[in-house]
């Protein structure tokens, strides 16, 4: 084989493998974005169901405006404009998150309009040995009866749902390294 032909094969092979690796990394990033949106939608639907259940059995109706505000990727506020019990809220949150397959730790707090502060915060962990007690939630203006939910492990939960993509990317990196090693070995032996 001539040197020019070998160089062409080496360059084409490297370009192809690097192109596949870049495409894989872009797909992994897009998969993360999609998982993040799916998680947000599941949380939104679950919190809306919790708000509806808190209104059941009362004389008040669920407001027509959206009661859920997404403050950040892992922090949601639900305005219910209705008095509710903390134990009932916790039960509804657990059951709705379980229905939606949201299997990550969360913490919540509810606003007490009498003391004008967030109270009764609780950390709900799927791992029973993990008991966090310090929960801080800021107070929000213009809301009277509301609760807040935070998912402290959202990012690790999303990464764990993308294990397949990371394994595939790692395998492609290994293939690239084997290819480079093979080319270096061929060039060192000068069998071309």
Where would I find each of the regions flagged by the language model?
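Extracytoplasmic
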Residues: 88, 95-164
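Cytosolic signal-transmission helices at domain junctions
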Residues: 183-192
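Alpha-helical transmembrane segments of integral membrane proteins
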Residues: 8, 12-20, 40, 166-179
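N-terminal membrane-insertion alpha helix
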Residues: 21-38
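Membrane-proximal low-complexity regions enriched in glycine and acidic/polar residues
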Residues: 40-112, 116-118
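Extreme N-terminal signal-anchor transmembrane helix of membrane signaling/transducer proteins, especially
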Residues: 4-26
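N-terminal membrane-entry
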Residues: 157-174, 182
